[in-house]
Amino acid sequence: MKKLLAIVCLFVLYVGVTAARADELVDMAQKMYPNEKINPINRPKSSLIVDANTGNILWQDNIDEVRDPASMSKLMTLYLVFEAIQQGKLSENTVIKATPRDEAIAKIYEISNNKIVAGVDYTVSELITMTAVPSSNATTVMLANYLSNNDPDTFLDMMNAKAKELGMTNTKWFNASGAAAVSFKGLYTPQRYDNNAANQTTARDLAILGYHFVKNYPNILGNYIPVYTRHNI
């Protein structure tokens, strides 16, 4: 069975897709999960499947439409964390002490979060898990701040430089987590980036990021993100 890395961008925007391609994708999903009811209303606006071994595109639909990746933005922050671990700048056991600001961000319930307590030590491994699984904005910012010495602009520069390096030509990062900086109620305020702007990327660019992530740091799968295997596809 081929190893597949599926980057399915479930962006609910006004941009339409061709009915034939979208319906085909819904039919494919229904065949993969015959016991589940796949509602066509949930069909993705952009979708892409690539071979995890080669990066070759196996399925595509509207892959170059620029959209807001929302919480999928956290993939780039995590990529930079894993890169820093490989470079020896920190380890999964490195301890980061939560600040009152971190706790305050965690209490912003309008954005995805989990409980963070000021003064408590969290390992990088724990923060990665909380970023990847419950999609915590607070822990994402904690990791970003650690790598940038608490300079959000520096970290955004790092994100955009890495996107350019990887060939993500239609990507622009304005925040580290997928929530516009203004959503943090003054607790996360980059100075050189528009605090009201949403991140911008495409399904193709996210596939590039996902391909390099799995290729360069495969332990993200299984250790932090569950892996589900389907046969005969």
Language-model regions, residue ranges each:
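Sec-dependent signal peptide recognition
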Residues: 2-8
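Active-site-adjacent loops and short helices of periplasmic peptidoglycan-processing enzymes
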Residues: 22-203, 214
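N-terminal signal peptide c-region/cleavage motif recognized by signal peptidases
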Residues: 17-19
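Residues that line or immediately flank small-molecule/substrate-binding pockets and catalytic motifs
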Residues: 8, 135, 227
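Bacterial N-terminal signal peptides
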Residues: 8-15
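Generic cytosolic/nucleocytoplasmic N-terminal low-complexity/intrinsically disordered segments
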Residues: 1-2, 88
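Domain-terminus/edge residues, biased toward the C-terminal soluble/receptor-binding domains
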Residues: 1, 191-233
